């Protein structure tokens, strides 16, 4: 009797992982990207934690993380990555007539390096492509982190 296909696939993954040292394994989280329009109290707590981990320059032109979240909810530009009913990363996505602009991308410090930011970016690229719009990144001028992300993703970078 052969095991079901799912069991065979899991066994194959285990065989592959057995040959990779634990220190070299990257754990990607199954993150679901969504527009945040009616956040729950827990979502608001998660968003506050996400942007509490943001460097000060990332909040520009907003006076605070709270102001950024409030403005993004008001204009419908807030997107977030969810895993196990918790928001782990967020960004602002402005859907313009000529192009879409992604800005203020931030992931909670405790979940960085697990694919949350990459998942937000990939889903944004997919949605922009489906809408027939080019995607551009936007960040305050002169920040190396934003320039590095633009270079890695081959996306144009606009100044906020």
Specify the residue positions occupied by each region the protein language model found:
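Conserved beta-strand in the GNAT
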Residues: 80, 86-94, 101-106
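Conserved GNAT acetyl-CoA-binding A-motif
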Residues: 128-141
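Active-site acidic-Proline motif in GNAT/NAT acetyltransferases
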Residues: 95, 108-114
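Conserved active-site tyrosine of GNAT-family acetyltransferases
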Residues: 146-155
């Amino acid at each position: 009797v052969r095991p079901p296909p799912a069991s065979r696939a899991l066994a194959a993954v285990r065989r592959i992982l057995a040959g990779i040292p634990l220190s070299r394994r990257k754990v990607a989280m199954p993150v679901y990207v969504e527009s945040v329009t009616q956040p729950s109290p827990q979502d608001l707590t998660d968003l506050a934690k996400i942007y509490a981990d943001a460097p000060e320059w990332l909040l520009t032109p907003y006076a605070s993380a709270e102001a950024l979240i409030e403005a993004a909810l008001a204009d419908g530009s807030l997107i977030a990555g969810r895993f196990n009913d918790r928001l782990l990363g967020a960004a602002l996505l402005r859907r313009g007539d000529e192009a879409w602009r992604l800005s203020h991308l931030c992931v909670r410090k405790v979940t960085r390096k697990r694919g949350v930011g990459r998942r937000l970016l990939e889903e944004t690229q997919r949605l922009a492509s489906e809408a027939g719009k080019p995607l551009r990144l936007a960040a305050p001028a002169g920040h190396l982190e934003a320039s590095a992300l633009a270079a890695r993703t081959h996306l144009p970078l606009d100044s906020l």
